[in-house]
Amino acid sequence: MNCSDLFYADTNTENTLHQRTQLSEVILSKGIAKKNELIEFLRQELKEAFDCDVRFWLQGSYKSHTLIKPVDKFSSYDIDIGVYLFFDAENEGVDSKDVKETLRDALLSYCSINNEAKLQESKNACEGLKFSTFLTVDTPIYYKTDTKIKLATDKGWSDSDPKAIQDWITNYYKDKSDRALMKRLVRYFKAWVNVKWQNTGFKKIPSLAINVLVAQHMKQHVREDDCFIYTALSICEELESTLIVRNPLNNSNLISMPQDAECFAHQKLDELKQVCLSCIKSDDIKRGAHFSNLFQHYFPQISLDSATGSTGLPTVVNVPEISVCRYDKNGNHVETIITDRLTVNKGDSLTFTIRNHYDFNIYSSAQWTVRNIGSQANDANDIGHSVTGKPSESHKRGTSYTGSHTMECMILHNGAIIGFKTIHVIVKPARTVRRKTLKFWRA
């Protein structure tokens, strides 16, 4: 197992960390269509409302080509559409709140003719829509003159030039391969944030801050995993004392969050630092285990054989003995087996239970990670998920997509991996129907 190739490899376009972070072409094309439709609607609506030239400029992750797949099928990705009004709003006494409210009314009108869109809760610096197709559109609105650009916020007009910071990010590296590496590293960090902040309620490290950090701290090595490790260590060192990322153009802080969110971010950055330090002197197998835990279902399935002691993980002393209880789509019990690989029909449900859970420390935890592979799962924005519980607790999952998938069970205690098992699940399209062969003679 080459851990670097699990991050990114020219020869592997199907199952790497980089590939698994990228949005499905089907999902992205739907989002682009919605984006274009919304722009054309707002162009006419706002032109009449403000009696001025109205233009649009895409910004954020979509513009910088660092969009990543949402963390699960219940989450969404963002496309940011900057709305520009070409008149001096302040000079004409136009209040920023009135501008935002007019934009919100226009978005509400759009929702009335598009049942896939719902109005988002208003934010200080933008309004937006949430679509049913995994898409969120944020629409910050500005006024622009020959000498200034101001963003409409609830607190007034604010200096802001997203195009300038985007140009800074785009042009930070001149070499094409350096730019490509930077974008990949940004995606890796965003995947890490998605996983570690999921369901916590804490504000995430903003995408713009991640872009600036990666640009300023990117370390180039022959191996892709080393690029991530040493870039992460440099970033962690930068943020260790104070969680501040300065805008390189105006010195403002790109990370602004409540104290509890800041403490949580420091905790996760400390964990990231320790993982990366552990990886420096580790072999590929041990690195793979660390990265599987770090990125969870975004990371490709790794292979460990803890039974033979060849893992390079001396702490792995017990192999989870997992039984799989299988039910068909009608809830009828089909079988209960202990196996490393099984074939099921789409619609079946599987319950995984660690039979020897008593062999593990009573304070350990079991992390169950589902990894879905294939176009059906990819287009449904469901490449997997991770659930943590007690080793004595069973875990149930469905079988919604045809293809080869895995269920990974990782037993953790005090941050150390003390057990590991992978079960491969082959999902067939449907129950096979045997056709009767009718033999007859022709006269």
UniProtKB/Swiss-Prot annotation:
UniProt-annotated catalytic positions: D78, D80, D138
Record-level Gene Ontology MF annotations: ATP binding; metal ion binding; nucleotidyltransferase activity
Residues annotated to bind ATP 2: N124
Cofactor(s) the protein requires to work: Mg(2+)
Catalysed reactions listed for this entry: GTP + ATP = 3',3'-cGAMP + 2 diphosphate; UTP + ATP = 3',3'-cUAMP + 2 diphosphate; 2 ATP = 3',3'-c-di-AMP + 2 diphosphate; 2 GTP = 3',3'-c-di-GMP + 2 diphosphate
InterPro entries in the cross-refs: AGS_C, DncV-like_NTFase
Protein name (database record): Cyclic GMP-AMP synthase
Function: Cyclic nucleotide synthase (second messenger synthase) of a CBASS antivirus system. CBASS (cyclic oligonucleotide-based antiphage signaling system) provides immunity against bacteriophages. The CD-NTase protein (CdnB, this protein) synthesizes cyclic nucleotides in response to infection; these serve as specific second messenger signals. The signals activate a diverse range of effectors, leading to bacterial cell death and thus abortive phage infection. The effector protein for this system is membrane protein Cap15.
Enzyme class label: transferase
Sequence positions that bind Mg(2+): D80, D138
Disulfide links within the chain: none
Source organism, top-level taxon: Bacteria
Family under the similarity heading: Belongs to the CD-NTase family. B06 subfamily.
EC number: 2.7.7.-, 2.7.7.65, 2.7.7.85
Organism this protein belongs to: Escherichia albertii
